[in-house]
A protein has these predicted regions:
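Conserved GNAT acetyl-CoA-binding A-motif
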Residues: 1-8, 140-151
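Conserved acetyl-CoA-binding loop-helix of GNAT-fold acetyltransferases
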Residues: 116-119, 125-138, 142, 161, ...
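C-terminal, charge/polar-rich interaction regions
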Residues: 112, 125, 129, 146, ...
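Short amphipathic alpha-helix that is part of the acyltransferase structural core
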Residues: 29, 40-75, 94
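Acyl-donor-binding surface of acyltransferase catalytic domains
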Residues: 1-46, 177-178
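A conserved beta-strand-loop-helix scaffold within acyl/acetyltransferase catalytic domains
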Residues: 71-122
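Conserved active-site alpha-helix within GNAT-family acetyltransferase domains
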Residues: 11-25, 130, 154-173, 180
Length: 180
């Protein structure tokens, strides 16, 4: 079945017609942005390793933290990360030899997109996510980024609170409609 992405720039009657035809909201995402020119970078509280390329440690930890077990996903996802055009910043936090946090910054002109912020369940609420974001934002700013954006699943209040504490502000919401 077809899946439609709906955003505030679209005529609201289209969304209404989809609803009337049995298309339900499947996923809602909030987009947040910040101006890095006025951002006062603070040092990360946890030690964050930054690399321009994906590592197997990073990828394996991402699969584990996401609960990814599908062998097809495990085969395809690495090629997607390797195919990212432009400069990337991969952030990793370790506890000994174990990866306990990941993050990704993708630089595009004067923007950095922040993605894949994950912290292992036993390490949450210890400022690790904040440290990852701080390290990515600082590095992106040093590489010429003036603005940052990210997407957060609507209802993920912990993540939204973290991003707001860093200076991100809500910009808009988009959602997907599909028939079930």
């Amino acid at each position: 079945p077809a899946i439609f992405k709906i955003n505030p720039l679209m005529d609201s009657s289209f969304d209404q017609k989809l609803m009337e035809r049995g298309y339900h909201i499947a996923h809602t995402t909030e987009v947040m942005t910040m101006n890095l020119e006025s951002y006062e970078p603070k040092e990360p509280l946890a030690e964050v390793s930054l690399t321009p390329h994906i590592t197997s440690d990073w990828l394996n930890a991402l699969f584990e933290m996401n609960g990814t077990t599908n062998p097809i996903h495990k085969k395809i996802v690495p090629s997607m990360y390797h195919a990212i055009p432009g400069d990337t910043i991969f952030a990793t936090v370790y506890d000994g030899d174990n990866v306990i946090g990941t993050g990704l910054g993708i630089l595009d002109r004067d923007y950095v997109g922040i993605y894949a912020i994950h912290v292992a369940p036993g390490y949450r609420r210890r400022k690790i996510g904040q440290s990852i974001c701080r390290a990515l934002l600082k590095s992106a700013r040093e590489q010429g980024a003036c603005y940052a954006y990210l997407q957060v699943v609507k209802g993920n209040f912990g993540a939204r609170t973290l991003y707001e504490s860093l200076g991100f502000e809500y910009l808009y919401t988009y959602w997907f409609r599909q028939q079930f």
